Amino acid sequence: MNPVRKKRLIIVLAIVVGVGAAVGLALSALQQNINLFYTPTQIANGEAPTDTRIRAGGLVEKGSLQRSEDSLNVRFVVTDGAKEVTIAYHGILPDLFREGQGIVALGKLGGDGVLVADEVLAKHDENYMPPEVTKALKDSGQLKHYENGKAAGETSYNQEGK
């Protein structure tokens, strides 16, 4: 093989290896940032993976909010109308978090079926509900019940009355 051809081959191989490494790193980064959404029904049926970061959403069950008196630990139940999942969270809940409202929690599902959340997202005004939660409620037939309660002027408050 002549020197010019050998040099071109080395350059082409270096480019292929570089592009392959870049694609591999990009795919690895994207895979780590994927958070799949699961409804309480899917979680209760065992469809959600354990020890993997997931998103779970639904309506906060009325009367389910339990706050620790000596720490920022909070437990509450989220439902899609059919099944429920308990969520444990350590931190300050969003100002718009209320029982009976739609939320999305990000965290890892433990073997006991409790989602240990590291982030809780609440709807940002009275007319907004996360798209995943809306779809889950629509699929379970609970969206009409939720909308009827809002139309009748029903409001829900957390334990602090906010």
From Swiss-Prot:
GO cellular component terms given for this protein: plasma membrane
Skewed-composition ranges (Basic and acidic residues): 139-148
Keywords associated with the record: Cell inner membrane, Cell membrane, Cytochrome c-type biogenesis, Heme, Iron, Membrane, Metal-binding, Signal-anchor, Transmembrane, Transmembrane helix
Residues that span the membrane, as ranges: 9-29
Binding site for heme: H124, Y128
Record-linked SUPFAM superfamilies: Heme chaperone CcmE
Any one GO biological process: cytochrome complex assembly
InterPro entries, alphabetized: CcmE, CcmE-like_sf, NA-bd_OB-fold
Main location as per UniProt: membrane
Mitochondrion keyword on record: no
Periplasmic-side positions: 30-162
Annotated region described as Disordered, given as residue ranges: 139-162
Function: Heme chaperone required for the biogenesis of c-type cytochromes. Transiently binds heme delivered by CcmC and transfers the heme to apo-cytochromes in a process facilitated by CcmF and CcmH.
Name of this protein: Cytochrome c-type biogenesis protein CcmE
Species whose genome carries this gene: Pseudomonas aeruginosa (strain LESB58)
